[in-house]
């Protein structure tokens, strides 16, 4: 049973948002392309022979080139654990991608057709901060969840992320001690300051003429 629907546009149109005047058919074709890629890759992944692995790796690279970010979202949404792992090996950066609606790949996994715990844990182990990401409506992945087991996992990661942020040490800024002036310069400055204060020079200065003699 599907836990919660995510609009197809949010994942499949991730890499190609329609521009002004673009026909809706372009989006539909993009959606079909990503889904067919996932289905084909899932079949190829079953072949564990040397040739089969080589064919899969080659096909995966092509699919990622065509849909660098949407592919991971689609695999996560449909519970393709092994594909998620393989995609991350080749395209690690796609884990931080978002849809036009602001959905992270964790949103897609939690709200997907098969929100397998294993996929959610894989994503969180790779990028714990995903648990705090908000979509365009300000909702975190836990807001899309309907499973008590998954909710516990998400809440635990949320606490860990918050705790890490609170105990993060302040950035160390080394303090440079002030440079000391040579002793001769210090003495000279002190003498000048004292002379100005007293109103006459100390060196070679006689008593003022109007002073009383005893």
From Swiss-Prot:
A matching Pfam family: Ank_2
Keywords: ANK repeat
Spans annotated as Disordered: 1-32
InterPro entries per UniProt: Ankyrin_rpt, Ankyrin_rpt-contain_sf
UniProt superkingdom: Bacteria
ANK repeats, residue ranges: 67-135
Compositional bias segments (type: Polar residues): 1-14
Protein name from the UniProt record: Putative ankyrin repeat protein RF_1081
Organism in which the protein naturally occurs: Rickettsia felis (strain ATCC VR-1525 / URRWXCal2) (Rickettsia azadi)
